[in-house]
Amino acid sequence: MGVLASALLAVQAPVAVAQKPPDGLKNPLVEISYEPPRTAALAEFRARLQNRYVLEKLQVFLSPLNLTERLVVKADECGVPHVLYTRGAPVVLCYEYVAKVDADAPRIGQVVQLGQAELTREEALVGPITQLVLHDVARAIFHMYKLPVWGGAEFAADNVAAYTMVNFSQKTAWKTVVGTAWFLKSGWDRPVDISDIRPHVAQRYFALLCVAYAADQVQFEGFLQQGPKPKVYELPVERANTCLYDYEKLSTSFMKTIFEPHVDRPKFEQLRKLEWLKDF
């Protein structure tokens, strides 16, 4: 996961060029492209992603997956920040989404507070883009492996993304979770659309914190309710009490439906040994 997170720092350094990952580690069934945007203002975001080899590093991250068919992932102009994944279509990282994340992030050198956590621009950039890519890849995998999903597929994909983020290093988990939480919290004022297939951003915020807190109660303790009544950003104690049970169910389903039948363990162990933030 850290390779993807480190790659996504592209949005903060437009002229930086990262080291290209070795071709031998890539998943050959993951095809990528950076489509030229029609809008001139979005060209810089394409360049940033290309300079950091973001999609090439996603190919490496997905290398342990034994895919049954081709998975196309592309960066493109969409007209909107996010295009919902549909069966058989490419996974798309929209330049408009990268631009929105960039605009909502703290300025360079600025540190902001989210509850008891301090948040840097780096974390605010890495988190939501990593989460979105993992979410949409999860949707594609649901279809590819014909996995049964009880309830909303969007909620299930959020859970897979969150579970993935918290199951690598503590540093990676912190950056991606806190950054995603910041981005979701910034959208709380969006009107509730009860016809939307995605949960409201406030629900997604607390679902993410629930997974994170259950995975590491020490690292994410600062998001837990501190006083007699929870503040707006805090995970209520009543909800936290159910998080461990929910996480156990999530872990069991992930292992039985994705990891055990579809992941190449030697490749996975090789992936985990890499020091992503330094190596790439």
Residue map of PLM features:
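Soluble non-cytosolic domains of exported or imported proteins
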Residues: 45-53, 119-132, 148-155
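Bacterial N-terminal signal peptides
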Residues: 2-12
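An active-site-proximal "capping" alpha-helix that borders the catalytic cofactor pocket
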Residues: 150-169
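A metal-dependent hydrolase signature that marks the N-terminal structural subdomain at the beginning
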Residues: 17-107, 114-115, 249-252, 256-280
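Pan-zinc metallopeptidase signature
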Residues: 20-23, 194-280
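Active-site/pore-lining binding-face segments in mid-to-C-terminal subdomains
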Residues: 166-216
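Cleavable N-terminal signal peptides
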Residues: 5, 15-16, 161
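Short alpha-helix carrying the canonical HExxH Zn2+-binding catalytic motif
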Residues: 109, 125-142
